[in-house]
């Protein structure tokens, strides 16, 4: 038992972090009563929920396009359909893996087994994530400005110092990983445009959910709040951001958006549900990926 805990201490710690975040979320909801939460869920418009689902699916296609552009520009002969299959399979698998990059590991494994260049695929996944983070960073001021307006000077100073350190680390990792694509600025620009499209539709998904419970907030405020929540979930203290994402979104929607705790928790939970639903095509594509892997192994024999 002790040996198992020693080998899996990071997973155990993340599991504890998720449980703690979910408990804190439950406490917030309990303060207003369970009835308020169920009432907020009943108020969600099916039409707006459907729109939110559709726009998130569109955002997934932009995310796939971002990675596909990087792969093709590096000389990997991969079809867009294969990129779709690998990405959705990774998204689906990430629901059951302990970190937010679990889906990337699945994508890399699948690409390698299908015979694509390992080094380029690994580098493309790193750059894919970095470009995604760069796009998110562009929307960060829309969340930081209203958040700092609520915070004390000491909190602002601490937050700025932490963000500055993160930014310096981000720039260093970016230049280390961009060796191939720095010579292909058009590919980098295309992937950045794709990630901006991905973000716009994610923000639109949250915007529609808010409309679905009768709240019309500024689109840019929604973008800022979601971006702040995104960066919080990158902290490796939970399983795939579970609990931490919901808790941070609940706090931001309550503090900056003016929603009640129950309404904020409803939106946060629905965001998680919609991401889960839109990952389900990965379950459909998984058999075809496995079949392609088996076919590749047979050909090599």
Language-model regions, residue ranges each:
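Predominantly cytoplasmic-facing regulatory/coupling regions of multi-pass membrane proteins
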Residues: 1-88, 136, 145-234, 259, ...
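Transmembrane helix-loop junction
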Residues: 72, 95, 112-113, 211-212, ...
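Membrane-interface alpha-helices at helix entry/exit sites of multi-pass transporters
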Residues: 80-85, 99-104, 114-128, 259-270
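Structural signature of transmembrane alpha-helices in multi-pass secondary transporters
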Residues: 90-91, 128-132, 271
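Transmembrane alpha-helix interface/packing and boundary motifs in multi-pass membrane proteins
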Residues: 90-99, 227-242, 246
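Hydrophobic alpha-helical membrane segments of integral membrane proteins
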Residues: 96, 106-110, 122-125, 135-137, ...
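Re-entrant/interfacial helical elements at transmembrane boundaries that shape
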Residues: 103-112, 239-254
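Hydrophobic alpha-helical transmembrane segments of ABC transporter permease domains
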Residues: 126-145
């Amino acid at each position: 038992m002790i040996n198992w805990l020693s080998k899996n201490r990071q997973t155990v710690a993340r599991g504890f972090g998720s449980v703690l975040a979910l408990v804190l979320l439950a406490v917030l909801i309990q303060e207003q009563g369970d009835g308020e939460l169920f009432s907020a869920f009943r108020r969600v418009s099916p039409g707006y929920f459907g729109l939110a689902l559709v726009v998130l699916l569109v955002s997934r296609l932009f995310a796939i396009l971002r990675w596909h552009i990087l792969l093709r520009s590096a000389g990997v002969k991969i079809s867009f359909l294969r990129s779709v299959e690998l990405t959705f399979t990774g998204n689906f698998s990430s629901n059951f893996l302990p970190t937010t990059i679990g889906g990337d590991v699945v994508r890399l494994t699948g690409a390698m087994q299908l015979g694509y260049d390992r080094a380029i695929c690994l580098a493309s996944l790193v750059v894919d994530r970095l470009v995604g983070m760069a796009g998110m960073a562009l929307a960060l001021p829309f969340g930081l400005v209203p958040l700092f307006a609520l915070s004390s000077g000491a909190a602002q100073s601490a937050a700025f110092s932490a963000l500055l350190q993160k930014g310096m680390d981000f720039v260093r990792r970016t230049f280390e990983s961009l060796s191939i694509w720095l010579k292909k600025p058009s590919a980098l620009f295309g992937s950045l445009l794709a990630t901006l499209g991905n973000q716009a539709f994610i923000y639109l998904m949250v915007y529609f959910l808010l409309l679905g419970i009768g709240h019309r907030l500024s689109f840019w405020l929604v973008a800022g709040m979601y971006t702040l929540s995104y960066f919080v979930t990158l902290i490796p203290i939970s399983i795939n951001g579970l609990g931490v994402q919901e808790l941070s979104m609940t706090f931001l929607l309550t503090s900056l958006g003016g929603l009640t705790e129950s309404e904020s928790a409803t939106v946060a939970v629905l965001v998680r549900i919609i991401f889960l639903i839109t990952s389900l095509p990965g379950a459909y594509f998984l058999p075809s990926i496995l079949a392609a892997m088996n076919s590749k192994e047979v050909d090599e024999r």
